[in-house]
Amino acid sequence: MSINKTLKIATRQSPLALWQANYVKNRLQQRYSHLSVELVPIITKGDVILDTPLAKIGGKGLFVKELENALLNGEADIAVHSMKDVPMQFPKGLELSVICPREDPRDAFVSNKYRTLDELPQGAIVGTSSLRRQCQLKNWRADLDIRSLRGNVGTRLNKLDQGDYDAIILASAGLIRLGLTERIRSFIEIDTILPACGQGAVGIECRVDDRDVQSLLMPLADQTTTYCVLAERAMNFHLQGGCQVPIGAYAILENNQLYLRGLVGDVHGSQILSAEGQFELSLDFESSQSAVQKAEELGVSIAEQLLQQGADKILQAVYQS
């Protein structure tokens, strides 16, 4: 792109979304000192409708549609998203260009009364609107009273502080990025609650034909995070899942081995299906395209294991409810 042109970043207006957009802006300007970068804050449907669970109004895709429209009509050059909010498919003409380094992928236990999930008394009120968290919490502790909790991070913390809940569950990455680490009473380990696909990662979407912008973005990509998140998303896509379904996935890349664990649960926690596997990624010898293909094949493989266990029946029941 022309050095005189301003790069415009579409972003939601929540504090966390603005942090992510500014993170991308700062990284770009550190690398390209003469590049002018401007934020284009946009209110999305998901930010406006706060009194209804996301699963009832179309899932987390509601947080990205208006940003994608800004890309398509030329109001913005790129859009910055939390990867766990990004739908599996993109509108024609748009693509996921870059996935940035991942923050802590775990969920966080936040409470003014208790230090851990284990300390919660019988019948404790726990706030979350995530079906993924709900099914795993109910499977672990059927006695817990899980209640809906919508809004940005500050809104959710305020509801906790007002006494509406004994505890709430939030993504630790958001709290860390907003400088609210002190609100985390404990991190919930992966074995207790498996994260959402892409949780903790920031993605950048742009137009397919905008090669100049894509070349600017490439230095921001994190190879390890990319392979892990693409494996998680491939699993989700093969399950025909979305962002607001009781599906969890988490991949790690260590010593050229890509490990992926996946989970599907019924919303009441009465049935949890899980599967895991690994593929070798010889990063020193394989092209990035070949590694991406292998990562996605691993995701499909884990999805197939879950489908063989009956995941499709569980998800069908969720969609019909």
From Swiss-Prot:
Which residues are recorded as modified (S-(dipyrrolylmethanemethyl)cysteine)?
A: 243
Gene Ontology terms, MF aspect:
hydroxymethylbilane synthase activity
Entry EC no(s): 2.5.1.61
GO BP terms: protoporphyrinogen IX biosynthetic process
UniProt keywords (A-Z) are:
Porphyrin biosynthesis, Transferase
Major enzyme class: transferase
Pathway note? Porphyrin-containing compound metabolism; protoporphyrin-IX biosynthesis; coproporphyrinogen-III from 5-aminolevulinate: step 2/4
Catalytic reaction annotation: 4 porphobilinogen + H2O = hydroxymethylbilane + 4 NH4(+)
* PANTHER family membership: PORPHOBILINOGEN DEAMINASE
User: What name is this protein filed under?
Assistant: Porphobilinogen deaminase
Q: Which species?
A: Histophilus somni (strain 2336) (Haemophilus somnus)
